[in-house]
A protein has these predicted regions:
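Loop-centered beta-sheet repeat module
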Residues: 1-19
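Hydrophobic faces of well-ordered beta-strands that scaffold small-molecule active sites
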Residues: 23-25, 60
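Short, basic-rich loop-to-helix N-cap that marks the start of a DNA-contacting helix
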Residues: 133-138
Length: 158
């Protein structure tokens, strides 16, 4: 059975060595194959967890392709797998408290992209808004709800 570290390693190879633009994943769906297939024999996973694995792989892919995160920055558990209960970006943030808080009014794009809840589009909005002056409130750049609360854990308005 593949571990996430192997999948991430191969994905990085596809991007770096073969210049792939995109990698796609598909969760194995039990009951569609012969009983000798390893996926059919794995009884411990529920359909929800199987699809969450796929979702986490897409999150890692996006972090690598769009955020410029390196494969070494993807945090895996002791057995070489992704944590299914938390977002990979948030796990990185929890393991690197020295990086936070990020100063919204001073940080570069790369640092802004390390803040859980901020993506490339929001980072661009922040950088463009700063041209006209200091951002006073995160709500002023369109953040609200759960995303706003998440950003507030890792960023300050200095």
């Amino acid at each position: 059975m593949f571990r996430y570290f192997e999948i991430v390693k191969y994905m990085l190879g596809l991007y770096k060595k073969l210049n792939f633009q995109r990698v796609y994943f598909s969760a194995y769906q039990k009951g569609l194959g012969h009983c000798s297939i390893p996926g059919e024999q794995n009884r411990e996973s529920t359909p929800e967890r199987i699809f969450m694995r796929e979702h986490r792989l897409y999150q890692v892919d996006y972090l690598i392709r769009k955020y410029g995160v390196s494969g070494d920055d993807i945090i895996l558990d002791k057995s070489g797998n992704l944590e299914l209960d938390s977002d990979p970006k948030e796990i990185w943030a929890e393991h690197h408290p020295e990086f936070y808080p990020v100063r919204i009014n001073k940080a570069g794009k790369e640092a802004l992209l390390r803040v859980p809840g901020l993506g490339p589009a929001t980072a661009d909005i922040i950088l463009k808004s700063r041209i006209y002056g200091k951002i006073k409130r995160l709500e002023d750049i369109g953040l609200k709800g759960k995303r706003l609360e998440n950003v507030k854990k890792y960023a300050i308005m200095e």
